[in-house]
UniProtKB/Swiss-Prot annotation:
This is NADH-ubiquinone oxidoreductase chain 3. It holds the Pfam family Oxidored_q4. It is found in: Mitochondrion inner membrane. GO terms for cellular component: mitochondrial inner membrane; NADH dehydrogenase complex.
Length: 115
């Protein structure tokens, strides 16, 4: 009985709100209010925007390094080892791996988007 009453109340309230919104007139209608706004860009213009592939590659590289740091760096402390040498060795290995991969990206000119 309570379920039926709750459903009936919700349905009635939703229907009432839809009817009120449909029948109320829009006040102060003018062209700027009814035109679409796309973050300062003209929505009626060309949909083709210039795309920088170098910037995209730098952004992807940043995301990869960021995920590596966020996911792999806590690994030595999450391994629950009591041996401090093992933990520090794992951490040092991961830091060296990140440094070597950063140096590789740098030498391959993967971090520059100006040519």
């Amino acid at each position: 009985m309570n379920l039926m009453l709750a459903l009936l109340t919700n349905f009635t309230l939703a229907t009432l709100l839809v009817i009120i919104a449909f029948w109320l007139p829009q006040l102060n209608v003018y062209s700027e209010k009814t035109s679409p706004y796309e973050c300062g860009f003209d929505p009626m213009g060309s949909a083709r925007l210039p795309f920088s592939m170098k910037f995209f590659l730098v952004a992807i590289t940043f995301l990869l390094f960021d995920l590596e740091i966020a996911l792999l760096l806590p690994l030595p402390w999450a391994s629950q080892t009591t041996n401090l040498n093992t933990m520090l060795t794992m951490a040092l290995f991961l830091i060296i791996l990140l440094a070597v991969s950063l140096a590789y990206e740098w030498t391959q000119k993967g971090l520059e988007w100006t040519e």
